[in-house]
């Protein structure tokens, strides 16, 4: 509204100036010349500001001489005309002064508007600087995300190399298992020889063997307690990993919400800038229209010519400033468009990252399904404890009862063991892993009187059934290993062949290290891998010691040799291939030659550089050991 009023005032002032110069320019010089011709004293009276008094004029005329009344009338008429002209000129001069004052006021108003526009421009520049700072922060966050992805790729490579080493170790463990089976067969042969020799032994010798079998069962109980503790540790570590994953997911959601808020604020500021630019363009168009109007010719004898020139110069200067502001606004609009494009790209990237995180969460849920097997294993361990109690009761009764009662009890025991040995045949491939962790089998009870042929035949049949059961369990273990290997291979292949992900955003082994983690996640994963190597070396040392003990027992059979069921149970516990990743590794594990491999050295170095990391991670080694060797 203020600009329109100024524009109207300028137009009215210009019209008044035109009318004034059109009216007064041709008349004023003619009147002046005529007055000069008639009487030379009239300009003096005009400059003095009034006409001569009648008395003076009369006296002047009397000095010259007597004149007629007609000449007096002729002289009075031009004086009156001159007085009227002087009055009109004074009125016009006052009007011109008023117009000059109004122009000065308009000039002040224009200057005030220019100051306000300068302030608005300064505010816009401040907003632009803030936008640039926000863009720089977004770029820094983008670089941080790229570094996190690079660290995840590096840890993925380490895990792939470690999986290769673990596959080699798996082959070594399978070889150890074959050697143990041979030792077990040798022990079974020795037991058969012992059974033949026991026909001539006394009852005291059998009681001594029963005592040793009880001791062996106590050892098996200790092993079961250790397995239970390991299961509990695995469950605790699994819960810690789940909490870690949830914390990372919450942090990513917070980052996404902050980014969305910043984008909304940037959009609002952009809209405000666009409105300001439109207002400036409107004001510029109005000023251009004012400049385009033709100016009236300047009067030669007006005293306000200098002020009008000054006003013109100021108007030209204002027009130049407005043009520069228009150029700046155009540049700002271009920058805003580029910023909008960058913000859209960042929104798309963030949306893709959200989709990837959701996919990873779904994959983690799918990979967490096999962990339900641990509950089944706990139930089976409870059932094995009950069986051990039953075996104890049966062995206490064997010393007092007859051969027939002992054979009947052995048949019942074999039936119960058959039921426990094959719990998952009708439930598909998901329950096959529970058969690999079967309860330790008790030593077969030896009857008191082996002199009869029927007792010997029943005892041999019992041993054959035990051997058949052990072979069947081994076959099922192999089937479970193949099934789990194929399943892991499919999942890892799906994660690695994912479009756009390229194994960057997918964490190997159940997603324990996700993409939103900080730089310490790489050291944490390396420490977990180093602890896993140490624990697995302990496992290999235990296998070697057990193998040496089995060979010694096969070469030197004696009354203190372990029963075949003990070795079978130990073999089954050895085939669990599941180790808790604790930092309390023994000295024998530290001296394992497998740590000298090139793939294990960088992991151990990262673990030494970042102590304390990896103590809370949980990665079951049986999952990593059965991963396929993926060639690049």
From Swiss-Prot:
Region (Disordered): 1-72, 423-445, 504-524, 552-573
A Pfam family the protein falls into: GM130_C
Gene: GOLGA8Q
Phylogenetic placement of the source organism: Eukaryota, Metazoa, Chordata, Craniata, Vertebrata
Amino acid composition bias (Polar residues), ranges on this chain: 38-50
Annotated GO biological process: Golgi organization
Compositional bias annotation for Gly residues: 508-520
Family the entry assigns: Belongs to the GOLGA8 family.
Name recorded for this polypeptide: Golgin subfamily A member 8Q
Keyword Coiled coil: yes
CC terms in the record's Gene Ontology section: cis-Golgi network; Golgi cis cisterna; Golgi cisterna membrane
This protein's UniProt keywords: Coiled coil
Coiled-coil positions: 86-148, 270-411
